[in-house]
């Protein structure tokens, strides 16, 4: 993929194999343990990380026996503890679309943004329903209110810029 100028993304972490619910419409609840997840669904992600996949996209699924409160996309347990710490992923984490029912119907946008930045999601997928200027303003307001720090945001910026440098998509002198 790199030779063709494409940045590969493994998705949807930690796997959609245990649900038939379409996350565009609702939030699936998956009843499995962490050990079961590591023994099956996480295997392709472990292999992708070992092969140095540059990015991983989250899945909007709630694993109620692992994190009963938040879906993977918003979960410290999955994003920080499992993906970053236990699996050792240092690349770019991409959210799945935030307009999808699994997120938009259950969580407010400001709360979603706080969790995304706090728990190391680097690229946030937003499309038709949001204006980027409004999102930037909202992030600035969250920083001013003390709900986010500039470092929360800049961690992702640094990872995205490192990925762009790795693929020759940014002039290092311009930074």
Stretches with model-predicted labels:
Residues 1-152:
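Second-shell residues forming the walls of enzyme active-site clefts
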Residues 175:
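Cofactor-pocket helix-loop regions in the catalytic cores of large enzyme subunits
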Residues 144-172:
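Mid-to-C-terminal alpha-helical segments outside catalytic/metal-binding sites
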């Amino acid at each position: 993929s790199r030779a063709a100028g494409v940045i590969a993304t493994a998705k949807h972490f930690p796997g959609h194999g245990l649900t038939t619910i379409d996350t565009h419409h609702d939030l699936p609840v998956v009843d499995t343990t962490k050990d079961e997840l590591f023994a099956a669904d996480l295997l392709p992600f472990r292999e992708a990380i070992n092969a140095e996949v540059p990015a991983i996209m989250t899945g909007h699924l709630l694993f109620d026996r692992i994190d009963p409160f938040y879906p993977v996309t918003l979960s410290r347990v999955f994003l920080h503890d499992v993906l970053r710490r236990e699996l050792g992923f240092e690349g770019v984490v991409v959210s799945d679309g935030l307009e999808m029912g699994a997120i938009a119907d259950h969580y407010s946008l400001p709360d979603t943004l706080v969790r995304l930045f706090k728990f190391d999601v680097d690229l946030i997928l937003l499309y038709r329903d949001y204006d980027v200027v409004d999102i930037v303003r909202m992030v600035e307001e969250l920083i001013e209110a003390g709900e986010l720090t500039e470092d929360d945001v800049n961690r992702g910026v640094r990872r995205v810029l490192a990925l762009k440098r790795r693929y020759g998509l940014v002039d290092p002198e311009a930074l």
